[in-house]
Each structure stands twice: as C-alpha cells, then as structure tokens.
Amino acid sequence: MTNRFTELVLDCHDPERLAAFWCAVLDFEVIDRGEGKVEIGSWQPTVEEVRARQMPPTIVFIRVPEGKTVKNRLHLDVSPIDASTEDEAARLLALGATRVDVGQGPGRSWVVMADPEGNEFDVVRSLAPSAQRLPADCS
C-alpha cells in the first residue's frame, strides 16, 4: 500500500491572514475555504491526479484557540527563483515576516524568518539565474 503526501496542516489563530501571507510568499492561490479553515496550493488537486503521481502538497490553515509557545519542530525552506536570498528576505519583511534568531549564528547563507503568527521558516539559496555565473566550459 502506498500513500501520498497531500497536505501540510498548520494550526493558527487567523487562517485567512496566514493563507494570504503564504499565497504571496509562494505564489499560491486559495483553493478551498470552510469554517475556520483555508487551503492554498499551486494546483487544484483531484483524486485522479493524486493517484497517478506525486503532486506538490497543499497547505491547510486551521483555526485553533491556543497560541504557538515553542520553536517549530518542522519548518519550511523556501528558495527564491527570481531574486537573491537577501532581496527575497526584504520582500518577505514587507509582507509581514520577521527575522528570527534561533541560534543559527552569523554569516549563514540562509535567513531564518517567521510568518505573522511566529512560525519559523528559512529563506535558503536562491535559484535565480545569476549574471555572474560563468558557462561550464569557462575557467
């Protein structure tokens, strides 16, 4: 028997606010709403597609009464595709993220941030084409 990773579920106080933040971060869309719940994704899942192949999971934000009290045991890493890591961190700050010190130390190639409800995530290496890269045959 095989399973598929279909959803990542985040408990939160304000599903609408976090869904809007993460839609802006990941260029996702809201694909479902319900009482105290918002689901976002890069695609509209169907049973047939999920059965046929592994598809990217959606993210579901569910309203809970309690707040976050400790560092996450699981976090997301995001890789910018059209900006440097620092430029993307600046964009995310403008969207409502904050920089977080979790003991990572100075001089790291990634930036630790938190979403508007304090859930940590990392902005890691940029996947943007670099004008400074040399072709493979150059030395």
Regions found by a protein language model. Name each.
Residues 2-3, 5-13, 39-41, 45-50, 53, 57, 64-89, ...:
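Vicinal oxygen chelate
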